[in-house]
Amino acid sequence: MSKLFYAFAVLAVHVLTSSPTTAASNLPVNLVTGPAFTTPAGAAHRRFLRSIHEGEDSLKPSAFSEERTALRAMAYLLKPKQKKLAAALKKSTSKHKLSVAPEKMKSIQVLGDPKNPEREWFKRLYNSKRGDPQTLRKLGQFKTEAQLSRYIKFYDDMLAKAKNVRVQTK
């Protein structure tokens, strides 16, 4: 049913657009864009930007020869702007290098730091029932191999501390 409706709608649009009455109804709109509308009778001729009219011009001859400007003159005008942009680009790249440094430092944090969140996480993993590094690796607890290697080092340090405590208490 809807296909039939769309077919009739397309047919109606086609008939209305091809009708000569449609073109006649648009005639007053087309008169607005005609030459009588753009240049009123008795008014002084004014030159619009890039118009091709000859005759009385309110603009000086140098102003309407904009297309004939030498490329070297344009390049000369653009040089200061290019220098400013180059300096800004140089600043932005050096600033970017400095902003990457704290991220790199986070990944190299010392595990002995008590405020290190990774150390706290490692402590929780170590105290859990499955604190073994290989078991945790199989469970997918570590995002990267570097994180796994840091946990193995932490695990070995904790085992060494536990052995020292046992030896001292005996």
UniProtKB/Swiss-Prot annotation:
GO cellular component entries: extracellular region; host cell cytoplasm; host cell nucleus
Swiss-Prot/TrEMBL keywords: Host cytoplasm, Host nucleus, Secreted, Signal, Virulence
Residues in the signal sequence: 1-23
Top-level taxon in the UniProt lineage: Eukaryota
Sequence intervals crossing the membrane: none
Ranges spanned by the short sequence motif RxLR-dEER, renumbered to the chain: 47-68
Protein's cellular compartments: Secreted; Host cytoplasm; Host nucleus
Keyword Cytoplasm among UniProt keywords: no
Induction comment from the UniProt entry of this chain: Expression is induced during host plant infection.
Domain text: The RxLR-dEER motif acts to carry the protein into the host cell cytoplasm through binding to cell surface phosphatidylinositol-3-phosphate.
Function noted in UniProt: Effector that is involved in host plant infection. Contributes to virulence during the early infection stage, by inhibiting plant defense responses induced by both PAMP-triggered immunity (PTI) and effector-triggered immunity (ETI).
Family: Belongs to the RxLR effector family.
Name of this chain's protein: RxLR effector protein CRE16
Organism of origin: Phytophthora infestans (strain T30-4)
